[in-house]
Amino acid sequence: MTTIAAAGLNVATPRVVVRPVARVLGPVRLNYPWKFGSMKRMVVVKATSEGEISEKVEKSIQEAKETCADDPVSGECVAAWDEVEELSAAASHARDKKKAGGSDPLEEYCNDNPETDECRTYDN
């Protein structure tokens, strides 16, 4: 080290500068949950009819009543009624979709007005 003495002032300057070692870090595994071995399973999704949904709603209501009979403020009771609410919403959406005929507004418009530009179809 070099010291400079001027009028009773000592200033020390180091001759070596230390730099931190840069390390290349790999990706964090938490950001890629699909790469975990335990997550490699298939779940088959099946559409249910409106009748099956209404039966499931009735069954879940009975289960919620039985669950809440002992302790109406428990977490299990809240979860049971949440399931009832979700199934009721699914049944309502199924009824609305059935009422609409299962078609989107453009299809309905094209059925009424097939000569418009939006509804033309071209065959090659």
Curated annotation (Swiss-Prot):
An example Gene Ontology molecular-function term: nickel cation binding
Gene Ontology annotations of biological process type: negative regulation of reductive pentose-phosphate cycle; reductive pentose-phosphate cycle; response to sucrose
A Pfam family recorded for this sequence: CP12
Acidic residues bias locations: 105-116
Disulfide bonds: 68-77, 110-119
Induction note: Insensitive to light/darkness, anaerobic treatment and heat, but repressed by sucrose.
Entry superkingdom: Eukaryota
Subunit structure: Monomer. Component of a complex that contains two dimers of PRK, two tetramers of GAPDH and CP12. CP12 associates with GAPDH, causing its conformation to change. This GAPDH/CP12 complex binds PRK to form a half-complex (one unit). This unit probably dimerizes due partially to interactions between the enzymes of each unit.
Further comment: Binds copper and nickel ions. Copper ions catalyze the oxidation of reduced thiol groups and thus promote formation of the disulfide bonds required for linker activity.
Protein name, UniProt field: Calvin cycle protein CP12-1, chloroplastic
Annotated source species: Arabidopsis thaliana
Gene from which this protein is expressed: CP12-1
